[in-house]
Design a protein with these regions (language model features):
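C-terminal non-catalytic scaffold/interaction domains in large multidomain proteins
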Residues: 1-170
Length: 170
């Protein structure tokens, strides 16, 4: 549990597969029981799991939110398109606001600009991301928004305010 807490405090998940490898080398049958007990123990109530496509990941809710853990799963599993879409949809649903593309270069994502460009190109034709659209402010700062949560006009107005107009109004 402390191992998971330490990793969570530094913004990292712990994959289940870590415990199968040296130096831990916990047998599969023992590991399942151990992790189930760990997650159900009242003393370790902060330890929870999130299911990824490739592994199950563990983190402590004392230092990491479920949303951040979900973002980390997408980064660890290198699912850049899904990571971008989920970030855009989360901001649109929660705040609502468009998502600044430059934010994808920051932690927990830390994507390179080439990765972002390639992912956005792939997303343009993929049906799972049909709701994700681009919008640009008058100072040419790119943003993304989800048509599930806002129209192009609203996204444009908000990104224009964020990038230009708020600085022109005292």
């Amino acid at each position: 549990a402390d191992f998971i807490r330490q990793h969570s405090a530094s913004g990292q998940l712990v994959g289940r597969s870590v415990f199968l490898q040296p130096p831990y080398s916990v047998p599969e049958t023992d590991l399942s029981v151990l992790l189930d007990v760990l997650c159900q123990d009242a003393i370790n109530a902060d330890i929870t799991r999130v299911q990824g496509a490739e592994d199950v990941y563990f983190y402590s809710t004392q230092t990491m939110t479920a949303n951040y853990a979900d973002m980390c799963v997408q980064v660890v599993e290198n699912d850049i398109c899904r990571a971008i879409a989920e970030a855009v949809r989360f901001d649109g649903r929660t705040y609502p606001r468009p998502y600044k593309v430059a934010m994808l270069t920051q932690p927990p994502y830390s994507f390179e600009s080439q990765q972002i460009t390639a992912a956005l190109t792939a997303m343009e034709t993929h049906p799972d991301y049909a709701d994700i659209r681009t919008v640009e402010s008058s100072n040419a700062e790119p943003y993304l928004f989800s048509e599930r949560f806002m129209s192009y006009g609203k996204a444009y107005g908000l990104c224009e305010w964020l990038e230009v107009e708020q600085y022109q109004n005292p």
